[in-house]
């Protein structure tokens, strides 16, 4: 018996996720929130001026969701992005890597024309 996979017809109102929040990143954030002992915490990802390439990424925990925040949930973890940062992060991937160089959150951003060697700074 042959099976043929058919692509689902996308809903015209369907909007792609603004960014990818990997399982690895969500699981690490969940672990950090559990260590803090405050289940109300959410991970806020933001872009601000600075760094050697003009913009830099930032991460912080926040209990509050602002009116202009975009919210994503993965594996029970909420990710917040403010409206200014959102425009720079659309299409990006937030991951958590552990390797010989250590452990860190990594953002792969298709909007960045150049990135710094440290990986936390970029320009558009």
UniProtKB/Swiss-Prot annotation:
PROSITE patterns: HESB (PS01152)
Comment on bound cofactor: Binds 1 iron-sulfur cluster per subunit.
Keywords: Iron, Iron-sulfur, Metal-binding
Disulphides: none
Cofactor names: iron-sulfur cluster
Transmembrane segments: none
Gene Ontology MF annotations: 2 iron, 2 sulfur cluster binding; 4 iron, 4 sulfur cluster binding; iron ion binding
Pfam families associated with the record: Fe-S_biosyn (PF01521)
GO biological process: iron-sulfur cluster assembly
Binding positions for iron-sulfur cluster per the UniProt entry: 52, 116, 118
Record family assignment: Belongs to the HesB/IscA family.
Subunit structure of this chain's protein: Homodimer.
Functional description taken from the UniProt entry: Required for insertion of 4Fe-4S clusters.
UniProt xrefs under PANTHER family: IRON-SULFUR CLUSTER ASSEMBLY 2 HOMOLOG, MITOCHONDRIAL
Descriptive protein name: Putative iron-sulfur cluster insertion protein ErpA
Organism: Ralstonia pickettii (strain 12J)
Taxonomic path: Bacteria, Pseudomonadati, Pseudomonadota, Betaproteobacteria, Burkholderiales
């Amino acid at each position: 018996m042959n099976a043929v996979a058919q692509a689902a017809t996308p809903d015209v109102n369907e909007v792609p996720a603004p960014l990818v929040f990997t399982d690895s990143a969500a699981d690490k954030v969940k672990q950090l929130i559990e260590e803090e002992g405050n289940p109300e915490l959410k991970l806020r990802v933001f872009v601000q001026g600075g760094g050697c390439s003009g913009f830099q990424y930032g991460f912080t925990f926040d209990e509050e969701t602002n009116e202009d925040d975009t919210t994503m949930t993965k594996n029970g973890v909420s990710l917040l992005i403010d409206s200014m940062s959102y425009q720079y992060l659309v299409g990006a991937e937030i991951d958590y890597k552990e390797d010989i160089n250590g452990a860190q959150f990594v953002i792969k951003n298709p909007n960045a024309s150049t990135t710094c060697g440290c990986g936390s700074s970029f320009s558009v």
